[in-house]
Amino acid sequence: MSLALNPVAFNLGPIQVKWYGILMATGVLVATLMAINEGKKRQIMPDDFIDFLLWAVPIGFIGARIYYVVFEWGYFSQHPDQIIAIWNGGIAIYGGLIAGLIVLLVFCHQRMLPPFLMLDIIAPGVMAAQVIARWGNFMNQEAHGAKTTLSFLESLHLPHFIIQQMYIDGSYYQPTYLYESALNLVGLILILSLRHRKHLFKRGEVFFSYVIWYAAVRFFVEGMRTDSLYIANTIRVSQALSLILFFGAIILWVYRRKVIKPKWYLAGSGLKYPYNRD
């Protein structure tokens, strides 16, 4: 296997630096730069995003690990020494997103920042980070789907290096990481191209759009994966949560449009953008 497909990018003495970590760090960096750039248009200082990042990243990782441990408690209850062994793998993005959301709400309260505005600013960057970080699963040959055939993968007109990386232990597998990354990229392009159109999105609705899109994508892709976390060995956790988020975001969107109409929320309020800070 070529170096480009080796999960280890390089070594620093005894420490292995893996592509997974590099791609995750790249995703965080891209998300931060996107938020800072958009924040300048909304009168949010760059320091606010940096300070938020310093709290959100470590707590997000802790949340991602706790989420995984909770739904794999049958194993970790017998191996408690492995609970903190995050270097062996085992984090769940939904856990990280939930933890990050909690941090954001607390942070906005302390800084007196409008939370839905911050969510609108940050959401596209989070989606971009997800697009990038999923390729870490590709490098690790994990988070894939069921067995498939070489002819099927070739019918997708995938680059040769992707097909070869999907050859694991003598069989080819569905590149579900690629499906999720590609679909999220489509969603990201749509959101970025539409979010500044006047009267299309009110405050909070860029965030709702992200939640609805990602929940739908994750529900679809999760049904193809072979490493899902389960509730009672029957219900896929991520699919159940995706349904809750999908319909929850739609309900909140409609509720805010129909019931809650503060000055900054109304179309034609004279603001440059419907979700500008005021």
Swiss-Prot record:
HAMAP family: Lgt. GO terms for molecular function: phosphatidylglycerol-prolipoprotein diacylglyceryl transferase activity. It comes from Lactobacillus gasseri (strain ATCC 33323 / DSM 20243 / BCRC 14619 / CIP 102991 / JCM 1131 / KCTC 3163 / NCIMB 11718 / NCTC 13722 / AM63). Pfam families: LGT. It is a multi-pass membrane protein. A 1,2-diacyl-sn-glycero-3-phospho-(1'-sn-glycerol) binds at R134. Its main location: membrane. Pathway: Protein modification; lipoprotein biosynthesis (diacylglyceryl transfer). The chain crosses the membrane at residues 19-39, 49-69, 83-103, 112-132, 174-194, 204-224, 235-255. Catalyzes the transfer of the diacylglyceryl group from phosphatidylglycerol to the sulfhydryl group of the N-terminal cysteine of a prolipoprotein, the first step in the formation of mature lipoproteins. Its EC number is 2.5.1.145. It is an enzyme of class 2 (transferase). Coiled coil: none annotated. GO terms for biological process: lipoprotein biosynthetic process. GO terms for cellular component: plasma membrane. It is found in: Cell membrane. It comes from the Bacteria. This is Phosphatidylglycerol--prolipoprotein diacylglyceryl transferase.
